[in-house]
């Protein structure tokens, strides 16, 4: 399946298509969108976003704890969409 992922960036909103087996960060890059990242392995917080609507699978990440995920935080480098969703990007500072 392919889902529509709406990214709310500091400079505006854009909607991309993302396959259920594709990380959101990779799909954004394929669409020419520059999102922050560092490790690309789900082990740091550089690419943090907040899921505002929809559902995601981020079982590949190892950085966020259950409380942070319950608040909607996700690491876009290791997050797959499981529905159409909306994600606010550039949210690393909100984690701490």
Curated annotation (Swiss-Prot):
For this UniProt record, give its keywords in alphabetical order, as a comma-separated list: 2Fe-2S, Chloroplast, Electron transport, Iron, Iron-sulfur, Metal-binding, Plastid, Transport
The highest taxon in the source lineage is Eukaryota
Listed under GO biological process in this entry are: electron transport chain
CDD domains assigned to the protein according to its UniProt record, in alphabetical order: fer2
Summarize where [2Fe-2S] cluster binds, as residue positions. 39, 44, 47, 77
Required cofactor names: [2Fe-2S] cluster
Q: Tell me the Pfam families matching this sequence.
A: Fer2
Q: How is the cofactor bound?
A: Binds 1 [2Fe-2S] cluster.
Positions of the 2Fe-2S ferredoxin-type domain: 3-93
Locate the coiled-coil region(s) and give their ranges. Answer: none
- Name where it's found: Plastid, Chloroplast
Q: Identify a single GO molecular function assigned to this protein.
A: metal ion binding
Identify its protein family. Answer: Belongs to the 2Fe2S plant-type ferredoxin family.
Q: Which NCBIfam families match?
A: fdx_plant
State what this protein does: Ferredoxins are iron-sulfur proteins that transfer electrons in a wide variety of metabolic reactions.
Stated name of the protein: Ferredoxin
Please report the organism this UniProt entry assigns to the protein: Euglena viridis
């Amino acid at each position: 399946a392919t889902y529509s992922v709406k990214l709310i960036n500091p400079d505006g909103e854009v909607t991309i298509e993302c396959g259920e087996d594709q990380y959101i960060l990779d799909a954004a890059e394929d669409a020419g969108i520059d999102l922050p990242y560092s490790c690309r392995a789900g082990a740091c917080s550089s690419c943090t976003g907040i899921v505002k609507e929809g559902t995601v699978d981020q079982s590949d990440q190892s950085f966020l704890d259950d409380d942070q995920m319950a608040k909607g935080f996700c690491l876009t480098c290791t997050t797959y969409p499981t529905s159409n969703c909306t994600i606010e990007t550039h949210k690393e500072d909100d984690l701490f």
